């Protein structure tokens, strides 16, 4: 959702709490608003390869809660489904467990709470006028979950199609979870770490 992030970078906002698998890097993704010091807290599962985030973390300018990726997606899903919390063995007995309620079932587990959002900013390949969405490839990982976990979902799409152009069995997010749609532009597909045979 690069165009949405560009718009956020131009707005007079601060103290944002973001929920994202990563913060981005190389001038793309949420790093655009990170370097403007607009993010107060971030929930994410990967922070590697981002020197700007590293600097702010070490300077205690941003609070980061690292969440194991499976737990991360389940916390988002729990918010969308109205689940008040769940126990998982992932992270039990580690730094992740600090300050969390623990219980033993078949093995030690920790209580994880849902991750709710005021806004979800997601990108889909296609949307129809009713807000039904279709995602391309890995964009389908977290986007449907975030659409359900947020009070307001803003969707940037590459292609606006007519109602019925997305077959019902191919709808990844139903329009009931979508409040705003716009067609974006100027998309690039950068490669974060290029590896070729022989290296």
Predicted features and spans:
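Conserved alpha/beta enzyme-core scaffold
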Residues: 1-199
């Amino acid at each position: 959702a690069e165009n949405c992030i560009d718009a956020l970078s131009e707005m007079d906002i601060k103290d944002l709490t973001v929920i994202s698998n990563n913060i981005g890097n190389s001038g793309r993704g949420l790093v655009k608003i990170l370097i403007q010091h607009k993010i107060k807290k971030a929930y994410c599962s990967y922070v590697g390869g981002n020197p700007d985030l590293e600097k702010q973390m070490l300077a205690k300018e941003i609070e980061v809660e690292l969440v194991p990726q499976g737990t991360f997606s389940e916390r988002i899903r729990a918010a969308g489904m109205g689940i008040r919390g769940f126990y998982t063995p992932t992270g039990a007995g580690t730094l992740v467990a600090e300050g969390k309620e623990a219980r033993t079932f078949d093995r030690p587990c920790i209580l994880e709470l849902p991750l709710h959002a005021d806004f979800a900013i997601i990108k889909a390949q296609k949307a129809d006028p009713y807000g039904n969405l279709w995602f391309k490839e890995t964009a389908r990982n977290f986007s449907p979950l975030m659409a359900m976990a947020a009070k307001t979902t803003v969707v940037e799409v590459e292609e606006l199609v007519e109602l019925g152009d997305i077959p019902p069995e191919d709808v990844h997010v139903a329009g009931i979870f979508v409040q705003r749609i716009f067609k974006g532009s100027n998309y690039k597909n950068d490669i974060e770490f290029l590896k070729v045979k022989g290296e």
